[in-house]
Amino acid sequence: MLKQLGAGSAIPAEHARLPDEVDNKFTLGITTQSGARVDLTLADVDGEMIYQVSSSDELDEDERKVLSELAKGFQAAINGMTGTSPAVRLSGLTQLDGKFVQSIDFHAEVAGPDSTTQTLDFHIDQTMRKASVAGPDGSAEVNVDTSTLEHAGTKQQQSKAISSYLAQFDQAVSRGHGDKKLMTMFKDAFSDLNRTAIAESREDFLTKPSKWQLSSGDRTALTGLSDFSASISQTPKSSNPRKDWEKDTFAYDVSQSTKIEGTSHEDRKIAQSQQSQLSAKFHTEIGKSGPPFFDGTLETQNYDYHQIDDSARSDVALNYRLGKLKKASLQQVASQSEQVQTFILGKLKSDKINPSQQALVRDLLAPLTSYESIKGEDTLNENIFLLGVPGELVARGQQF
């Protein structure tokens, strides 16, 4: 397959046409800047791997080189999906060389137990990245806006922000009793797609001036990530045979949006919002964290039914006038609510709601304009990241 790509000549679409029914199927579609469309397909047919390659036009030497490098990412993505537990491995396909490639599309279908199918779809072009996962356990999606990289930070800053978000995802799946395998795929997709930074250090930004050139202080007050939206939703299950309306569910949404506007760079306004929402329902043994045993009899109808409704938000606002920072603020809120209904022999015995909320408000003007802020850039930046647990927001407020 790689030799055919390296040859560079056009390959008819009907070459090595695949049968309609295959066990596992993987496709990679590439559109070059010259307009050529290249499609690679690998499929498992009765235990034998076969392939199909097609190109709409001849490729030049640079295009062939780029496609050969992408083929390595294609193989890595395939290896991830065909492991013991399907995994998302897309980093090799996110390295889009805009000089030669317009867009990349990847699709995977992997057969699972009981005639189920796990799918992964990925798209990348000059303005966006998108990955979606679907299977018997549920679905997940990650969208990243790369139409402007003006507020994207350094690679190191993005790594810190991603690590912070991954910790939030772990807390959410634990609190909501979500599917850990599905969450792992979600985390992998989130991590791979959100690494959009090009700069190694902040000095690199000075070599690429733009209309909304951000100052060092601006970047300290922002996450460094490109704007994104991501969600994960677990397939509802009815674990209690006597009450099939009591579903076990898990849904989590998280996003970031950034606006940079104004009449000029000297009078710019920057606003960045991060938010998350967790909704989950699940059964446990009374007073415990493990699942109850149900066999359809009344004697096993002793359990707690939990309903989780959490949200978090972080807002940063920076206002400049005549080139000077006049206002800078941080507002963060974390709210958690858990309703616990206790049933004994199928009858409701107690119904309690445990709410918790904390807020943090800080004026960032002094930290961002003082000489000491140079020393504390990293510390200040780490306090910008979203927190979903009220207790953690309290701890942040005591240190910040």
Q: Which residues make up each language-model segment?
A:
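Detector for methionine-enriched segments
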Residues: M1, M49, M81, M128, ...
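N-terminal, intrinsically disordered, small/polar-rich Type III/flagellar export signal
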Residues: K3-D114, Q118
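A eukaryote-biased signal for long
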Residues: L120-F400
